[in-house]
Amino acid sequence: MADTVAEQIAALKDEDWAIREEAATMLGTLRDPRAVVPLVFVLRDDDRAVRDAATSALLAIGEPAVTTLGACLSDPVLTVQELASSVLATIADARVREPLVKALASPDWIVRMHAAKALGRIQDPRTVAPLVPLLQDKVKAVREETSSALAAIGGAALPSLIAALTHTEWLVRLHAVEALGKTRSAEAVNPLLSVLFNDRDRAVREDAVRALGQIGDARAVEFLVTAMKEPGLRPLAIEALGRIGDRRAVPVLIEVLKGVERPEVSQPIDGCGDQWDEDMIALGEAAKALGTIRDEVAIPSLVKALRFTVTRADAADALTRFGGTVITPLLALLARESDDNIRYHIKETLARVGWRAGRV
């Protein structure tokens, strides 16, 4: 009886690149651990299609390939390191923790990026210290994967991430803030509030607002309301209030939505600049937030917002979150509205909450 795996392994050495590619693909389908070492050797193939097929095959084989791929992280050929680390980013386990930590110092940013991602998968607290310096890596993709890895590690990384909030380099602070948001840890709230009001860099403060929204702790509500007064932070703070979902924010959000009735908003003029754009964004975010919180007190304001172009779509989406509760006020608006365009959108919103068009 023919040994299909052995046949395909032999075909990896064929002179025809198409045959080598097909063999690698077939070995990925068969998922036999015997193919790991031959496939790793093919990572050095001159043809990219063959290398890619071998990479996919190793990924398909999975766990049996982990330790062999870990050894590839010190291969003298950088391409082999890149391909091996890319697979480990998805299948790594604790057996390759040490080679991955060493790979964080690779001169190749692709290897550093994949190594950081792989360590996030392993989630070993011992990798926090070697990961933290990569928050200031010159390559954005490396910084982002490091931030995600530290967030995945969670509690063990919190002290290092909180300490990084006072780093002299703004990029380190920025990615530390992002990581803390991803952890969704209540312990990060007070440090992030300090960043929100004290950091000298606007981008860092903006990310602090986003992170507080991700965490969703109600302690941040009153501080986010205060942050709404700062130009540039207003739309972000409104969005964060919606994500937190605390009803204390509802009156503030309704007040924001009332801004759509101002003449300079409902009938914009040329030359209003960035502030006008920010006001438009804030109005939409307020409608979205009210829909997320779903306090029925907000329904009249959202119904009224249907009449204005700048808020119509977001208000309609928000109203649908309330379900059948909004049918009566929408029908009342429909009865007194003469504008055909507005009437169309009212009917569309009614249909989305289950009101049949034939009954309108």
Enumerate the language-model features and the residues they cover.
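Structural detector for internal amphipathic alpha-helices that build alpha-solenoid repeat scaffolds
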Residues: 1-2, 18-32, 41, 48-63, ...
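Core helices of alpha-solenoid repeat scaffolds
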Residues: 4-5, 36, 66, 97, ...
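Disulfide-bonded cysteine-rich modules in secreted/extracellular proteins
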Residues: 5-12, 73, 104, 159-165, ...
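Amphipathic alpha-helical segments within extended alpha-helical solenoids and repeat-rich scaffolds
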Residues: 259-261
